[in-house]
């Protein structure tokens, strides 16, 4: 009974500390670095953390059965739904260092349980260099170190979902791999405000159970942590991904120009294309600016990606398995893309009320435009259509752990010559979410 009471008291102490601890995927809970008079009393559980959050929500779409990136597509005969978007529990353990106040090792395990099933979201080990406290090594299943929006935890993200581009190019945000990080822990170090990550990953993420080829994704990111000047702060980063996957056939489609001047896909059917690597290459830049006031804060975020993405005729989504149809590999389509995310966050009256504005776009094929898509002989498909989403939202913070989120996402698509896309689709979504974190 005594042990149970001690564990319960420790759990309460831990969760109260961790409410604002871990904002980004694969980061270490900052409360592990806190020294106080309580921890020595309950040493057995002092380095264990249990955290989590739950997001029940109700949604209404503008039509039945729409394809949506606001928590997934709707059923064919439904335009409203209750759903448990996320319900996650995370267990973390830090092994104290004998030579410094920083951990020597850190382990994290996170599961997500909803009406759609239970899945592992994080499982990784992080080892720290404890002599100069500048380097760390991470291995396992963890967040890809690319961009700001991808790495911002859904426990803290203001709008209900990440942008369409994030979900297509980086489905489920995480991957299996290993990463080296440079992040000086000593605040006196001139580079303590910078973090550099360099990792090697399978590439398929959580959408596949194993690597379907031997090609790995090299991902790197340099990030400048918030630089503060009075009530103003600015931060930003640069990201790079270099990877790809093997062609399953000799047919590789690339952008070109037809005899009549139209943008088209031209097929290369050289036998040597089989098992060659279809390039996957991303470049990204992001910036975050924040101004604090006595009654709240104003924040602006901007992020831009561009690069090359392999796919099939029907999709530009990063695959979890080798794309096939009826057991036969599909031809590869090489597209050049760009996209961006913009956030504007504004407290109203006080910190309990927050206005949200968001705009994002994803153009999967910047070489083609509008009425070119759908013309006979171009080999262009709905996978080449540009989409943009404008979102408006409101958050009411009941307390530090509970908030209500109301948002409305308005989706627009390119008007093309493609049947079904000759006008704007009706695919807007209203979301009402209750968010609780512990």
Summary of predicted features, one role per range:
Residues 39-63, 70, 74-206, 212-219, ...:
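Outer membrane beta-barrel
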């Amino acid at each position: 009974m005594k042990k149970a009471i001690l564990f319960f008291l420790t759990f309460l102490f831990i969760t109260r500390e961790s409410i604002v601890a871990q904002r980004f995927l694969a980061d270490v809970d900052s409360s592990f670095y806190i020294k106080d008079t309580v921890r020595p009393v309950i040493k057995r559980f002092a380095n264990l953390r249990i955290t989590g959050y739950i997001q029940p929500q109700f949604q209404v779409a503008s039509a039945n059965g729409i394809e949506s990136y606001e928590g997934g597509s709707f059923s064919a005969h439904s335009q409203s739904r209750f759903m448990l978007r996320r319900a996650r529990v995370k267990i973390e353990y830090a092994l104290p260092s004998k030579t410094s106040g920083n951990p020597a090792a850190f382990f994290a395990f996170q599961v997500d349980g909803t009406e759609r099933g239970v899945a592992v979201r994080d499982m990784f080990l992080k080892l720290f260099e404890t002599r100069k406290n500048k380097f760390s090594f991470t291995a396992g299943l963890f967040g890809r170190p690319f961009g700001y929006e991808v790495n911002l935890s859904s426990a803290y993200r203001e709008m209900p979902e990440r942008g369409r581009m994030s979900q297509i190019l980086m489905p489920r945000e995480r991957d299996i791999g290993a990463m080296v990080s440079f992040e000086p822990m000593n605040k006196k170090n001139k580079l303590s405000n910078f973090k550099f990550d360099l990792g090697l990953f399978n590439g398929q993420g959580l959408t596949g159970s194993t690597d379907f080829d031997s090609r790995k994704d090299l991902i790197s990111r340099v990030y400048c942590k918030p630089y503060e000047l009075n009530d103003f702060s600015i931060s930003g980063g640069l990201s790079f991904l270099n990877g790809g996957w093997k062609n399953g056939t000799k047919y590789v489609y690339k952008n070109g120009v037809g005899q009549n001047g139209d943008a088209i896909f031209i097929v290369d059917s050289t036998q040597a294309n089989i098992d060659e690597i279809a390039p996957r290459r991303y470049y990204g830049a992001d910036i975050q600016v924040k101004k604090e006031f006595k009654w709240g804060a104003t924040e602006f975020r901007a992020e831009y990606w561009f690069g090359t993405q392999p796919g099939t005729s029907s999709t530009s989504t990063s695959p979890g398995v080798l794309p096939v149809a009826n057991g036969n590999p599909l031809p590869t389509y090489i597209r050049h893309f760009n996209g961006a995310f913009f956030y504007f966050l504004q407290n109203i009256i006080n910190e309990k009320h927050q206005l949200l504005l968001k705009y994002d776009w994803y153009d999967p094929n910047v070489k083609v435009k509008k009425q070119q898509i759908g013309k006979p002989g171009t080999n262009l498909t709905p996978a080449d259509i540009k989409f943009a989403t404008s979102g408006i939202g409101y958050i009411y913070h009941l307390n530090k752990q509970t908030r209500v989120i109301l948002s409305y996402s308005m989706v627009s698509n390119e008007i093309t010559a493609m049947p079904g896309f000759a006008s704007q689709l009706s695919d807007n979504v209203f979301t009402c979410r209750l968010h609780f974190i512990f």
